[in-house]
Amino acid sequence: MTLLKNDTFLRALLKQPVEYTPIWMMRQAGRYLPEYKATRAKAGSFLDLCKNTELATEVTIQPLERFDLDAAILFSDILTVPDAMGLGLYFAEGEGPKFKRALQHEDDIAKLHVPDMEKLQYVFDAVTSIRKALDGRVPLIGFSGSPFTLACYMVEGGSSKEFRTIKTMMYSRPDLLHKILDTNAQAVTAYLNAQIDAGAQAVQIFDTWGGVLSDAAFKEFSLKYIRQIVAGLKRESEGRRVPVIVFAKGGGLWLESMAEIGADALGLDWTCNIGEARRRVGKQVALQGNFDPFALFGTPESIRTEVARILADYGHGSGHVFNLGHGINQHADPEHAKILVDTVHELSRQYHGG
């Protein structure tokens, strides 16, 4: 494999000295970029884009051509795993992801099993192809949804505002939900390990919906299964550590519990104070975040002010990867994203070295 020319992102995740704070953006390859829209149109549909190795590589690289980012993230979707389980993923115009066969009956849940990873070969092919295209420029991040977040879509049959169906199952038939979650955890472990084998140099677990749970439920139905995954992941590849990032949106209440599961870093959403988070768990884990995606809709001056505030809140030393507190909004101005990236690099140097 090619030598990594910029390993700042990996070093920051392991709290090793860096010259500046690295930055990447969740959903950095996406609809806010006109070049992404053009490639997506060429692919025909979102799923076709995910499954086309050449085009998935193209859209992964696009933001790196535009911005001085310190990592690339695989272009894919968290729902590839339940799709491989045979639930029939499709995207309804204006409604987001849907499943033809939602898991709402005991018989269907009993039949659920870890999918053959060959069904997800298109993802691993994309990882290998992207690594080749990157040619050591920056590290490549692989990812998956968390068992609970995947279960939300699998049980609800799509996205939801109140999660009534899955919460009803959780409180009335927890045994059924635990069966789904355990299957998901085994599948995600195999999926991420296969991404690492294909060339992913760090992995992130997205727990997008963990924050809708009560304190006790989060620990029993979400964190327990993320811990199971982290324990089963390959942590060494190509002679270096493969860092694991866990991002639970709305998870600021549970940082101490999350810091104990063996991950290298925790992602923070924009509602957390990063300085306070560092005081709470900074000895155990690196932190990633946590610029409000909608702060990109401000002025260039307000973007710079917000970057300066977050960097100052975190303070001196390594262990911070700058990111948004959630995915970049599709209506964001790419020029403002560029200001964000360049400002982080410019203003963060004073917090490192010396």
Curated annotation (Swiss-Prot):
Annotated catalysed reactions: uroporphyrinogen III + 4 H(+) = coproporphyrinogen III + 4 CO2
Site, Transition state stabilizer: residue positions: 77
Keyword terms of this UniProt record: Cytoplasm, Decarboxylase, Lyase, Porphyrin biosynthesis
UniProt keyword Cytoplasm present: yes
Gene Ontology molecular-function annotations: uroporphyrinogen decarboxylase activity
InterPro entries for the chain: UROD/MetE-like_sf, Uroporphyrinogen_deCO2ase_HemE, Uroporphyrinogen_deCOase
EC number(s) reported in the record: 4.1.1.37
Keyword hit for Hydrolase: no
Top-level division of the source organism's lineage: Bacteria
Subcellular location as annotated: Cytoplasm
Pathway(s) the chain acts in: Porphyrin-containing compound metabolism; protoporphyrin-IX biosynthesis; coproporphyrinogen-III from 5-aminolevulinate: step 4/4
Cellular component per GO, a single term: cytosol
GO biological process, one term: protoporphyrinogen IX biosynthetic process from glutamate
SUPFAM superfamilies in the cross-refs: UROD/MetE-like
Binding site for substrate: 27-31, 77, 153, 208, 326
HAMAP family per record: URO_D (MF_00218)
Subunit description: Homodimer.
PANTHER family the UniProt entry points to: METHYLTETRAHYDROFOLATE:HOMOCYSTEINE METHYLTRANSFERASE RELATED, UROPORPHYRINOGEN DECARBOXYLASE
Family: Belongs to the uroporphyrinogen decarboxylase family.
UniProt function note: Catalyzes the decarboxylation of four acetate groups of uroporphyrinogen-III to yield coproporphyrinogen-III.
Protein known as: Uroporphyrinogen decarboxylase
Organism: Neisseria meningitidis serogroup C (strain 053442)
Gene that encodes the chain: hemE
